[in-house]
Each structure stands twice: as structure tokens, then as C-alpha cells.
Amino acid sequence: MRRLSGILVIYIISTVLFGHFTNVARARYHYHKGRHGVTHPLPPPPPPPLETANPPDQVPSDPYPSPDPAPGDSDSGCVFDVTSFGAVGDGSCDDTAAFQDAWKAACAVESGVVLAPEGGVFKITSTIFSGPCKPGLVFQLDGVLMPPDGPEEWPEKDNKNQWLVFYRLDGFTFSGKGTVEGNGQKWWDLPCKPHRGPDGSSSSGPCASPTMIRFFMSNNIEVKGLRIQNSPQFHMKFDGCQGVLINEIQISSPKLSPNTDGIHLGNTRSVGIYNSVVSNGDDCISIGTGCSDVDIQGVTCGPSHGISIGSLGVHNSQACVSNITVRNTVIRDSDNGLRVKTWQGGTGSVSNLLFENIQMENVLNCIIVDQYYCQSKDCRNETSAVKVFDVEYRNIKGTYDVRSPPIHFACSDTVACTNITMSEVELLPEEGELVDDPFCWNAYGKQETLTIPPIDCLLDGSPVVEEAYDSNYGC
């Protein structure tokens, strides 16, 4: 009886232990499968997430008829290699039709990918890639994409003001490890382009030259990983967009290439520009009217004309810009650093600007507000102006080009700049020991800490006419 009881106890203990180890083993090998088709782009450290854009109009279910499958398509039904649609990729043949056909095919399916593969040099003429498209569309550029070489090769029927246009898209990504080559040299050499003389002066005459990449009336756009270079004019432009993320791109053109702004924003909201390098012949980043909630971090800028807000208020127009942040950025060998420029006679406002943790290296006009911006010698004096207020400069350090004072606040005679805050600003001459005095005109603000050079020219308090301005010019 005792032997039987012992056997029964051993059996019960063995059963319990076996069940326990089985559950442990199952727990070790249990996993959660990710959702199919969901991508997780690397978050740009350290910026906060962008604000959620307002939902756009509903996208039609099938904007393009499905084309017949092209021979040699990828095993994935969602990847449309342009070479399968007839692209040659030798840098000489016109591959425009192949890109248009691949776009139509990818646009018609969810998570479609237009692929320009590595090793190809694809030449296409001025093209509008339009939507609406199915969700998740990607243009993957791993080769080289370029326009015709100069104005003489540009087709007569094509628009000379733009080359690649992305229009009416939502949830679109332009990415890859490839290069967008602008072939800009012959455009820069046109006699109507501004050219800088040996004395530093320039003569200008407007003439049509294409912006290389333009996003127009689109939402939730991402551009990442690309190299964009030698644009005839602006490298990348966003007009009427909302929800833009630009991450880990390189933009480059020669220092004296005219009008080659790196990234230009106009009437665009909720923008993040992160971890990128821009060197060019004009503004690194320019922010025009109608822009708000722009976050710029981790950018290396220069040689260039710096980071600019404006020009604003031209031809007596109203301009509204607000909530712009520039942090953790380097500006080097540039004609300007952090600039706000407005024309006389405009209305509206520029407000809530934060410039923080900026390193300057041999920069002319490190900090500048210019409310007398003019591109000729005959601009007349006017009483109205775009109001500039609530501007913070924090931890701005480095060296400046001694040809101009490092701090310059030239505010309107009638519409003062107000609530300017300076904290931990230390700017020393790149050459020599003489520190230039800042310039202030009708600028109100405060120093939270001592600055180098000392900025004793800021006025205390607020101007008497402030209330009258707010009732007439507010955005």
C-alpha cells in the first residue's frame, strides 16, 4: 500500500512539472506578428512628432485604368520598375514615357512603388506626376534622375518654370539612395541671371529657369535619403501642402549658383526638416507667406545664404508666418545666418520664432531682421509693414565675418519689432579682435543674459502705437 501511494505521488509531481515546463517553452517561443504592409520610418531624433494634418478629401478608388502587365515585372505586384516599361537608363534616351506609365500603374494600386533602379541614369523631360492615387504610393529612386542638359535641349513645348511636379497626392513618399541631378550649369550661365562682380555687386534680370522638384497641393509627404544637386533654380519647393517630413537628404550646388534655394516653403503647414545637409548659392531654407508650424533640427547649412523667413509683403501684400523653430543647427561660410526680411508697404505678421542651439562659423549677418528689403535702388519709403514680434534667440554661438555687424535689427519706422529675447548669444569675429557693435532701429526686447557683443540698443517695453497696429494688421 505504501509502495502504491509513493508511485501515485511521483506520478502527480511529474505531471505538474511537465505541464509547467511545457508552458514555459511555449511562452518563450510566443511572438506577435506585425501587421502586413505597415511601414515604420525611422523617427528623426530628437524632434517631436509632427502635428496631425487635417484629413484631405476622399481619394477616388480607381483614378487610373489598370494597364496591361509589362514584361519583366518584379515578383511583387506592387513594384513597378521603370525598365520594365521601356526605360533605357543610359543618360541619353528620353525615358519620360516609361516613368509616366510606371506612375500610372503604381498609382492605381495600394502601396504601389515606382522603382528607378540602381545603375540607371534616367533622363526625363518636364513631367507632372499627379494624383489622387491609392494609399501608400512610393517613388523609389536608387539610380540617377536628370532633366535635359540646359535650355537648348529643353523641349520647346515644355514648361521652363518647373521640372518634376508632384500634384494632389496624399500619403506619398519620395525616397531612395539615388541622386536627382539638375544639370544646372548652362542655366546659371544665362546672361539674364544675376552675376556677382568682383566688387561684390550683382546685376539681375529675371528669366525662366526650372525649379527642380515641386510638391503642389499635397498632404502627408515624406522625402528621405536622396541626394539632390545642381538645380537650375530652387532645388525643392512646397506650395499649398500640409504635413511634410524631410529627413536625411543632401542638397548641393556651387556657392555662386544663382537662385538655387535648397528648400522653399510657401503656404505650407506642419513641416519637419531634420538631419540634412544643404550647401548652395542662395537660401538653405526659405520660408514664405502662409507657413506655420515648421520645425527644423539637425541641419548643416552652408556655404549658402542661411535660413530665411521671407521676403514678405512685396507689392503691398499681406504676409502671415508663425510658429517657426530652428534648433541644433550649424550655419557656416554663409552670407546670412538667421534672417527675417520684409518689404516696406506690406501688412500681416511674423510671430513666435525660436532659434536655439545654433553654431555659426564665419557667417556674415549672423542675426538679422531687415524690414527695408529691396532688390533695387529706387524702392520708396512706405508707412505700413509686416509686424515682427515674439522672437527668441537662445544659445547662438560662434564666429562672424567682420564685413558686417553680427546682429542687425532694422525694424520699420512705424511698425516696431517687439518682444525680442536674447539669451546666451556669443558671437566673435572670425578674424581680428575688434568686436562690432550690434545695430538696432525701433526694436524692442530684452537680454536675459549678457551677450557678446553687448546689445544695449534694444528698447525697453512696447511702443505706444501697438494697439492700433494689432487692430489693422493681425493675421
Curated annotation (Swiss-Prot):
Keywords: Cell wall, Cell wall biogenesis/degradation, Glycosidase, Hydrolase, Repeat, Secreted, Signal. Coiled coil: none annotated. Its main location: secreted. The keyword Secreted applies. One of its GO terms (biological process) is carbohydrate metabolic process. InterPro entries: Glyco_hydro_28, PbH1, Pectin_lyas_fold, Pectin_lyase_fold/virulence. One of its GO terms (cellular component) is extracellular region. It comes from Arabidopsis thaliana (Mouse-ear cress). Residues 41-50 have a biased composition (Pro residues). One of its GO terms (molecular function) is polygalacturonase activity. Belongs to the glycosyl hydrolase 28 family. This is Polygalacturonase At1g48100. The keyword Hydrolase applies. The lineage of its organism: Eukaryota, Viridiplantae, Streptophyta, Embryophyta, Tracheophyta. Pfam families: Glyco_hydro_28. It is found in: Secreted, Cell wall.
